[in-house]
From Swiss-Prot:
Residues 56-102 form the F-box domain. InterPro entries: F-box-like_dom_sf, F-box_dom, Hrt3/FBXO9_C. This is F-box protein 7. CDD domains: F-box_AtGID2-like.
Amino acid sequence: MTSDALTIPSELESALRLRTVQYFITKRPWLDLYGVHVRPVPPFGSTSRKPHFDPALIHRCLPDELLFEVFARMMPYDLGRASCVCRKWRYTVRNPMFWRNACLKAWQTAGVIENYKILQSKYDGSWRKMWLLRSRVRTDGLYVSRNTYIRAGIAEWKITNPVHIVCYYRYIRFYPSGRFLYKNSSQKLKDVAKYMNFKASKSENLYKGTYTLSMSDDKIEAAVLYPGTRPTVLRIRLRLRGTAIGANNRMDLLSLVTSGVNDEEISSTEEDILGLVEGWEDDETHNPDIPAVSHKRGMTAFVFVPFEEVDESVLNLPPEKMDYYVTG
């Protein structure tokens, strides 16, 4: 009797406590769904004991074989964007075959054997690591140098000392073969990008040249021939850099020199202009009528703009909206 008398008050006390708690707790049935992982059942008639995982719709439409063929035809920077879609694509993009093709195309002037030696000695046999860390010029867009200067205007009856902000551009498009196109114009980026190729007509004033990239100091030596009655060679020296690893989206303009050349030299080395001026001094010229001139104006750094961004780039803004552009 004594033990029963002791247990009854404790049971009543717990019941009263639960009744009091019910007033403070709101019933939320959806909370019961948290932590419950619903796994799909295997198809009817399947003899497999492994758990069945239903793939996403995009994975059903693109089997692994077709996905591999699509990635094999994509540009390297498009592969980087595709790796952000899902985990499966990220693992697929790490296939070394994609990056091997990109590396051999980017450094095709060095040769296959030399690229394999550099791969094993510096990048631990990883083509993707080589693509990210080795210096290279980008060929999927244009390098643009936007330059502005102030020019005095004509005095009018309202304005006594008018000034104008003049804007012009230097455009460079590189090719993996060691050739490039150069243009100096006041036209906007979105207009020049349409015809910046070797198929452009002579009226577009595109100049062809050759270049080399030094892997030791990331410097680019380039030369362009200005044809005409008095042929002139434009020698360009640049330093390649990037705002992020593997970006290679900036080029500092170190020097810009124009020199005269002989007609005999042009006829013998018309395709390899850089080989013609190799070893020349900055003040050297081979035509006494055309002295060597080292230009100091218009030395703004080049900024890389991919082809898919030329229409929306801020470099298209007029001087009234952007008088100066900080390259960074």
